[in-house]
């Protein structure tokens, strides 16, 4: 029986101890140890493997300086989002060796990176974390209208996807860590921006902003409208659908809704989700449908490279917008006019 037990358990030894994105992150943190302020904000264990959730920060240490947070890997299957943030971190370190404009920029703003929020899920190739909880459904608030069956968040059990966790239970460690990072590193500042990179929904790429729980207007709609307008003028062929998430679907427990509502009202906190549309990748390579990874990530190397190139402009734009915020943040009558323009664009009946 002892031999049989050993034989049955043997396949576990062939499971990898890590995964490519996590090793990339460790290499980047090692390379950038003299430039980044590195923290471990929580740890997670999956099948005997332990992974740390890291943040890396760089730039101004002034707590009043504008800041941008780049997040990825909240869903373990969506590797391309983590790859995008990691690629940007790697490029940033390379540019620091010669880019004087970047050095000056970082004297006035701060960048915070959290590229793999859910390393346990990414190692296990699951959307959820090791406890079976979908982190992007884990916040306590409920939508104020009906949500899509299951996909909007459910409490039936972890054996079904989009599980929110038990009602009244503490939030999952990874979700709580993300919220702490937002609270201490971003939302406490007069201006902060967050970009959370996901994949797997739609024929095209989208930039979503609050709310996901309601169709009501976010208080900083004028600021979001200005940001959209500036980006379109700087990159007129960008191809993103820039809209409230509620235009697509409502959901329970969205972390960014929760973080946004907790931010001090006197500060401007602008959280966004970059949703990379994977359906076009599947259309070009239908065999991806038969792979869990292929449903959420480009498989062919040239397609992955194209995705990483394409979205770097957005990340650079957000950093420049934060640096130049005094030139575009709306005030007074202009803000009221922009609010009406935003309502006309996103909330008139014909736009819904």
Go through the PLM ranges and name each one.
Residues 54-64:
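Short beta-strand-to-loop junctions in surface cap/lid or active-site-entrance loops
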């Amino acid at each position: 029986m002892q031999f049989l037990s050993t034989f049955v358990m043997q396949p576990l030894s062939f499971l990898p101890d890590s995964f490519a994105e996590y090793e990339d992150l460790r290499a980047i943190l090692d390379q950038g140890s003299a430039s980044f302020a590195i923290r471990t904000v929580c740890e997670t264990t999956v099948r005997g493997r332990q992974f740390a959730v890291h943040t890396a920060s760089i730039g101004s240490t002034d707590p009043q300086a504008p800041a941008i947070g780049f997040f990825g890997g909240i869903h373990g299957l969506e590797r391309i989002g983590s790859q995008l943030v990691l690629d940007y971190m790697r490029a940033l370190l390379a540019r620091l060796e010669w880019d004087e404009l970047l050095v000056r920029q970082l004297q006035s703003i701060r960048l915070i990176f959290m590229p793999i929020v859910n390393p346990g899920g990414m190692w296990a190739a699951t959307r959820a974390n090791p406890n079976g909880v979908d982190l992007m459904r884990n916040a306590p608030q409920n939508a104020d209208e009906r949500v899509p069956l299951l996909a909007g968040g459910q409490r039936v059990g972890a054996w079904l996807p989009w599980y929110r966790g038990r009602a009244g239970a503490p939030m999952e460690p990874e979700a709580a860590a993300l919220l702490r990072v937002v609270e201490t590193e971003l939302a406490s500042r007069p201006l902060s921006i967050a970009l959370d990179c996901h994949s797997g929904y739609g024929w095209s790429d989208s930039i979503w902003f609050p709310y996901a729980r309601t169709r009501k207007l976010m208080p900083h709609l004028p600021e979001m409208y200005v940001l959209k307008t500036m980006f379109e003028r700087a990159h007129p062929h960008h191809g993103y659908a820039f809209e409230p998430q509620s235009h697509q679907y409502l959901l329970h427990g969205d972390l960014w809704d929760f973080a946004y509502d907790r931010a001090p009202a006197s500060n401007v906190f602008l959280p966004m989700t970059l949703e990379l549309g994977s359906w076009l990748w599947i259309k070009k390579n239908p065999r991806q449908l038969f792979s869990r990874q292929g449903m959420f990530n480009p498989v062919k190397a040239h397609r992955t490279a194209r995705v990483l190139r394409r979205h770097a402009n957005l990340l650079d734009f957000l950093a420049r917008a934060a640096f130049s915020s005094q030139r575009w943040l709306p005030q007074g009558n202009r803000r009221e006019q922009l609010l009406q323009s935003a309502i006309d664009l996103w909330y008139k009946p014909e736009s819904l």
